[in-house]
Amino acid sequence: MIEVRGLTMRYGRTVAVDDLTFTVKPGLVTGFLGPNGAGKSTTMRAVLGLEIPAAGEALVDGHAYASLRRPMRTMGALLDAGAVHGGRTARAHLGCLARSNGIDSRRVAAVLDQVGLAEVADRRIGGFSLGMKQRLGIAAALLGDPAVLMFDEPLNGLDPEGIRWIRDLLRSLAGEGRTVLLSSHLMNELALTAEHVVVIGRGRLIADTPTGALAAQFQRDVLVRSADPERLAEILRAHGVSVAPEDASDTGMHGTGMHGTGGLFVRGMDAAEIGELALRAGIALRELTPRSASLEEAFMELTEDSVEYGAGPAARSAAVSEVAR
């Protein structure tokens, strides 16, 4: 378990992390989200004892990381895949880490095989691609067979096969009862990997919730299809809700909308109320689908006021539209 309690990090007059509190529980992959400059990496460094807080604390299984005698046996972490000696081989790098933490040398070969680097174990790290360095960093995190794991942007440099591999790996590790904290900018992938999310902005906690619940908070609308869309739209508008015909660009389908298959996007009324209105009016419904925001859309709405450097409203709206498609 990772516990962050009232953590505050200051650099001169700048408050990078502001009274931040959250818990990363075992048995789940927890996504750690925030705009650039939100304080994610600073928080992770504080968990590893690499930064000294102005106030509060960060604990790993109830202890400060710096107080652990064999830290890699308790917690494995990947913060920077490039922070390795390029002149060493992968095997030598992991062997050095194993010796420093009293880890059985047989674990070196085991983790190299686990991350798919067994065939290049004796190549110098300086010749590795970014994706290979990421795999090596993951191997280092797994070396001590720890119960707690923390990864900062581990998907960088990985190809689609590698991304799928790490998704399956992290979920498997969490399924074994381990604590897994994952930071990533790849929202769609994070939505498939993380069961829980912690969102911060300007160093403060914004959300700490199951992934599905976060997206559900930002329900976009209800998609309704009926045999008489024009009459249904008239009834709905009479009840003060927003109604718009479905556009082909929303689904990639042609012939939609009031003059096609009867698709309407309804805002301001939930699916149950729409169904009751249609029933009373004698209008048969073909589809009634609440549409929640994607994780990326929910994240952008949540952090809109916490972005240090970002595009204007029009550009953000266009970006969300592209993501939604």
Predicted feature residues:
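ABC transporter nucleotide-binding domains
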Residues: I2-V4, M9-G201, A207
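Conserved NTP-handling cores and scaffolds of large molecular machines
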Residues: N101, G177, G240, S292, ...
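Short, flexible cytosolic linker that couples an ABC transmembrane/permease module to its adjacent nucleotide-binding
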Residues: A110, G212-A216, G312-A314
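Hydrophobic C-terminal alpha-helix "anchor/cap" residues
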Residues: L142, L236-R237, A278
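ABC transporter nucleotide-binding domain
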Residues: I166-V266
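C-terminal coupling/interaction segments
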Residues: R267-R325
